[in-house]
């Protein structure tokens, strides 16, 4: 589409729906995990046009119950804020272009958040920050999740990107300020690599024309490798924690010579399943 903004159109007649994904990618840092996660939560709930959840839901209902979501997470050494919407194929709507409506909706969500004067709406910001902290606190009650996080710290180190949960550190979440999070949003909007994918029974040229609706200026982006590696360890690290629970948890991590792009990736997946990494093991 333009420098720093990529589009992939995948025409397919297999489905009765069309899915549109917009991903904002940048090199991940520990300090930015918390504010970027909160940005995703804020953009998922309100905009200048749809100021509350009721109006937001009505907008989706007008597209015959379109499904929509925003998520934030790590992709190897990269961080991704992703927007996804799925609508019925235009062939089933009597000529109404739901694909164009969906792109207009995404543009409203991405480029016109409920904010003014360099700050998100105060009430919305406070609510979403509290909700995120409550989620983090409740997640630590999941013992399997807790054990997995302790293993990540052992394997990667507590202050490396892979040793920290995708939502960041709780202390960072607690200290987030409105202006800081809004600045993170502007940086995402202006500087992240944007990857857009559209899949379904669509006309490729028409979709590209509709994607021009998105207010995404060109940008120069230089991303590092998505592949992450362990630090070399002279001997295995161990941690044993005794807690008042009914079941014991055993989590293991191995550094193996395989990546998602290597020829032996599928062999590594089978190995992982055999060693307990799958319910089928």
Where are these regions (language model features)?
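Scaffold signal of the M16-like zinc-metallopeptidase fold and its non-catalytic homologs
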Residues: 133-190
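Acidic/histidine-enriched alpha-helical segments
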Residues: 57, 112-136, 223-231
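A common structural junction motif
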Residues: 103-116, 213-221
